[in-house]
Amino acid sequence: MDGSGDDYADGDAAAVDDETLAQIRRAGTAVADGELVVYPTETVYGLGADALSTSAVERVFETKGRDRDDPLSLGVTSVDAALAHTRPTSLATAFMRAFLPGPVTVVVEREASVPDALTGGRDRVGIRVPDHPIALAVLEETGPLTATSANVSGTGSVQTAAALDESVRAASAVVIDGGRTGGAESTVVDPAAGTIHRRGA
């Protein structure tokens, strides 16, 4: 990551700030109502919706202008939370326990609870456990979220809430400002296949 220590200090402070906690609670209500939220992670800002709801996932694709064949990842609070919705190999489970939380997305076989809309109909899904206090607090409040950058597809990822595209901001019920993020998107790894799909943070 290229974020400074001061940036992280700001995020840590925001994690216990009363206003941020109130925003996190509002995010929980918004996600339960099928709406979108923007939240900071240790890499870039994420666009979140109920990852287990087809209609909510569709709203993410529409907002980003993203191809439906380009899958989204599943954001959760922990590896154990991921196991409730996936069937990873023992190797993949060990990999997740070694590297998560952190700026890595791990591709594993999904359970039926994960909708086709999230994965583009594929039988595998990327698992993301962010290493950021606000992101984890949001996930604790909401349950599994879409883990995708809060940008319009084809444009750069967003490192500050102020840099959000106006269309993304308008589509989001809650925008949680956690200061500047690290900047590089997560590395995407499929341990079972021995493949790195994207090199990132």
Regions found by a protein language model. Name each.
Residues 1-201:
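Active-site-adjacent structural elements in enzyme catalytic cores
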